[in-house]
Amino acid sequence: MTKSVGDEESQYIEDPSFAAAAAFTGGRDGVSYSNQRFAEGSGHSSDLAKSLEDYRPPDEKPSSLSSVGEGGANEEEKGGNDGGPLARIQTGLFSPRLRNHRKKILSKFVLNNFFIACVCVSLISIYWGACYGTDRYFFKVKNIVVLQDAPSNTSVQSISAIIPSLLASVPGTWHIYNATSFHRKFGTTNSTEIDRKIVDLIYDERYWLALNVKPNATDTLYNSLISQDANSEFNSSIFFESVFESGRDPSSVKSTILPLMQQLEVRLQKYYVKEYLPSLMSNITSNDRDLNINMENWAIAGQLLFTYNDYRPFADRILMAPLQVGLIYCILLTVLQLSLYGKLHGEMARVLKPKHILIYRLLISWATYFLLSIGFCTVSAIFRIDFTPAFGRGGFVVYWMSTWLVMMAVGGANENVLSLVIAYCPPYLSIWLMTWIILNISASFYPMVLNNEFYRYGYIMPIHNAVDIYKVIFLNLTKRKMGRNYGILVAWVALNTSLMPFCMKFAGKKMQKNAMQAAEAAVAAATQRASRPAEANTDKNNNPPGN
């Protein structure tokens, strides 16, 4: 059956995003027939035929036109009008012909490096800023101090009485209670309930640090000083307990927040050794000159130390992999799967209806994330990470399903944005990837209380909520926030899914426009070449091509 040039041109315009490929690889019949029409001198069809002839591979072309030099003149030809091929002549970098090219190179070099410098200053500074000026935000670190000690001897001042004054010079926001006010505030009735409630407050993340000064601290010290019984020695670590959870933030609790409690300990030690204990000993000896002193008890009483109880310790360094850098790889994996499916997505887009394209893309993406997530989680299992602290033997399944949800959240955003970036500005693809990673990790790897208010956007970022969930799985932290964490991740999946049709539509229109512009440029170039003198297309015997 005869195939008209008009049909070939119609296909070229109807599917512009694949026009060049169709003309280059699948349109050989069209090329040969178009050449015949060109020889016959047809009008517009000859232009298209010439354009298709130019897109043929070099080994299939009977000849190629000479290249145009910088000044517009044809460069040196190899072969000429004897039917031999024409080719570009390569030259040196410092050739006078490349003067304009050298200017272009210099201009691009300056502009590109200026742009990269701006990216470094604007994007990377976001991450650096999350670690900068930490001491300026200590006022947001809430801590609690409970002073249960109340001496039975009213003539003796409590050891802990000075603590409120000392806290005035220690950074942080300190909430101070005695036993009575604590009972009234939190509904406890005795010392045991106070001890338990303090641990619960730290576990529920109401406070970062707690100091619990237990009852009878001063009485025990006083009795050890006046008693000859060696068993009545004063052990300060029994009465001064500091409670915290290093697992709440492995990078900052021990290195940045816990030193606040240690500052208080140092100040209290200094006061105790230089003022309180000498005054107490002086009162004891002046009131009872015949007292037989147990010098060992007096020596032991000369030191005051806190007990530091870490109820959720961060003890296994391998956990830094899934809790921090591993989440960056999680983002990158979602981009990898998108690039691997790119060619297939293009093929399916030509044969599926718009509605079914959306269904196909969602099914492929979610199924891929499902398998990617189990592979990602298996790496943690290979390195013997414990999944059981919070959910027992089901911990791995919780980790797997959570990772799948995280991948759908970050991957869906990548898929939508990258489709627009590729359509409108492909060179900036890496800029989006850097931006997405930095925005996520800057507000996730460090506690909000030690950052500027700017970083509060992190509460809605997928990686921040993933970190909170993983800390529960691996470190058995409070589950109080898990509902919010999962809700935000589901919201991301829903948002990405609802935006996908619009992103695909805008990207498709832009790519279609780009393809049409390329097609018009090709036709214009073909028209210009076809308008050259007829003798430029004849061989040395003045025979038309194909005869």
Swiss-Prot record:
Residues 50-62 have a biased composition (Basic and acidic residues). One of its GO terms (cellular component) is fungal-type vacuole. Residues 35-86, 526-547 are annotated as: Disordered. Keywords: Membrane, Phosphoprotein, Transmembrane, Transmembrane helix. It is a multi-pass membrane protein. The chain crosses the membrane at residues 109-129, 159-179, 318-338, 363-383, 394-414, 418-438, 457-477, 488-508. The keyword Protein biosynthesis does not apply. The keyword Protein biosynthesis does not apply. Residues 526-536 have a biased composition (Low complexity). The modification Phosphothreonine is found at T91. It is found in: Membrane. Pfam families: DUF3533. May function as a N-methyl-N'nitro-N-nitrosoguanidine (MNNG) export permease. To yeast YJR015W. This is Nitrosoguanidine resistance protein SNG1. The lineage of its organism: Eukaryota, Fungi, Dikarya, Ascomycota, Saccharomycotina.
